[in-house]
């Protein structure tokens, strides 16, 4: 028998209000309540253990500042050395895969879920998900929104406030709404930082 969970995980339209999915979201919210409200910031070991339990797969080193929100949790995979600042939202119906050394600014939102444009289908409760993939060494600035089906390439920087509706290639600086590539990131950016911001005795 095909369940709504099976349909969701395979990327097909499904009814999110059905018990097999709503119960999973409730279980996730219970864990998130503890993560966001009960554990103190100083309880680092407990917080790390709980976020690793909430998410489907993580690296050894991970820090997610509270508050954090996701729908299911098990649909999210993050690599080594992941950091998300406060207010991160991951609607992970379609799955989210994040590489190593990824940095999220505050209030970053990833939305993998889509709804039908047709009103009758939408009112029946149908939805579907499309995976978001973020490569290695990516910095996503504050208040960025990344929409369903988007891939962000390695070593890319997404400027604050961007709304990412299409794939962004590797080694790019991308900004705006809708997000567009401003230019490539090169070694000149390293040299600029070293000479402008590093203290030289």
Feature roles, as predicted:
Residues 164-165:
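Short hydrophobic beta-strand element within catalytic cores of glycosyltransferases
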Residues 1-61, 179-201:
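Terminal amphipathic alpha-helical/low-complexity segments used for targeting or macromolecular assembly
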Residues 68-78, 83-151, 177-179, 184-195:
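Flexible, glycine/small-residue-enriched loop-and-beta-strand segment within the central core
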Residues 103, 156-157:
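Short alpha-helix at the nucleotide-sugar/activated-sugar donor binding site of glycosyltransferases
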Residues 139, 157, 173-175:
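Short-chain dehydrogenase/reductase
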């Amino acid at each position: 028998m095909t369940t709504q969970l099976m349909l969701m995980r395979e990327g097909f339209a499904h009814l999110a209000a059905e018990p097999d999915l709503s119960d999973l979201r409730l279980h996730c919210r219970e864990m998130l309540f503890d993560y966001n409200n009960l554990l103190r910031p100083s309880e680092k070991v407990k917080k790390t253990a709980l976020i690793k339990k909430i998410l489907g797969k993580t690296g050894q080193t991970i820090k997610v500042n509270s508050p954090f929100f996701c729908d299911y949790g098990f649909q999210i995979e993050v690599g080594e050395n992941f950091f998300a600042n406060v207010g991160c939202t991951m609607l992970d119906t379609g799955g989210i895969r994040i590489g190593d050394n990824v940095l999220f600014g505050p209030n970053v939102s990833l939305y993998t879920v889509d709804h039908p444009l047709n009103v009758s289908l939408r009112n029946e409760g149908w939805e579907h998900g499309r995976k978001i993939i973020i490569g290695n060494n990516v910095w996503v600035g504050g208040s960025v929104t990344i929409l369903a089906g988007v891939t962000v390439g390695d070593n890319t920087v997404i400027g604050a406030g961007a709304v990412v509706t299409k794939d962004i290639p590797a080694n790019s600086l991308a900004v705006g709404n809708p997000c567009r590539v401003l230019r490539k990131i090169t070694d000149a950016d390293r040299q600029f930082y070293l000479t402008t911001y590093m203290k030289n005795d």
